[in-house]
Amino acid sequence: MSKIAIVQFKASIDKTKNLPRILQYIKQAAKNHADLCAFPEYMMFFTPASQSAKQVAHQAEAINGKFVSAISECARQNSIIVVGTMLEKSKKKDRVYDTSFVVNKSGKIIGKYRKTHLYDALGFKESAKMLAGRIIPLPTKTSVGKLGMIMCYDLRFPELSRALASSGSEILIVPSAWVNGPMKEEHWLTLNKSRAIENGCYVIAPDHLGHIYSGRSLAIDPYGRILLDMKKRQGIGYVNISISVVRNTRKKLPLLKNRRTDLYSNFRL
């Protein structure tokens, strides 16, 4: 059994104000005996539409910069796994990567994922400020289970989650900044539950709160049961999970095993 802490909070546009809050959340989660603490997308800083691409890039950092280094050290001092997010510098002066990372209990970065599906939909255009990642990392092995990393809009593309589950993911971690709008919360609930059910895995989905975002951070079990729904509450939610539930679910309901991939060769997936 592992205890997961999910952080739901409203970030400032100033990363120097957000970092102390993030470190405090990590310490609080560790004090409450959590094994892993997961944060939402844009935890580093909120980027309003009025902010230019160059302004966003100016605040971005390398993965080994001060922001992630401080989080890594806090994880080490408190012996807790941290899944965080950042806006990562690229070679272009006006573009960043939307990146999630995994830090182990020793403070070492053991996983990194650059968001592959940018939110160019429903009036938004993330590609005006960001670059899409081009690699789907294999699941990250941790003491709580094998983590598959996706982010927010990625939820709408089931091939990504299926590829990770087929490669051994037991927990999908989905840091998000899910924008408000007609039917958007319904989509959020349905998509997270669907990814859990069809892959027989846990889904841990920390969501950003406030600004234009929905909140509703979730933890869902392999049968699609909602174990935690944080609604509009700012702070930390806790949930206990067991990887044996994933193994038993996949044994009783062997969706990955029963797939007929031999039938798909003539289709463009």
Tell me the role of every PLM-derived stretch.
Residues 91-167, 180-190, 252-255:
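Active-site catalytic loop in hydrolytic enzyme cores
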Residues 45, 101, 112-119, 218, ...:
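Short beta->alpha transition motifs characteristic of CBS
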Residues 15, 24-105, 179-197:
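Cys-nucleophile CN-hydrolase/nitrilase-fold catalytic domain and related Cys-dependent amidase chemistry
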Residues 1-13, 38, 99, 112, ...:
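Active-site-proximal beta-strand elements of phosphoester/diester hydrolases
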Residues 17-28, 157-162:
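Short, acidic/polar
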Residues 247-269:
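A short C-terminal boundary segment appended to hydrolase-like catalytic domains
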Residues 84-86, 99-102, 138, 217-219, ...:
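Short beta-strand scaffold segments in enzyme catalytic cores
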Residues 60-83, 146, 155-237:
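CN hydrolase (nitrilase-like) catalytic-core segments centered on the catalytic cysteine
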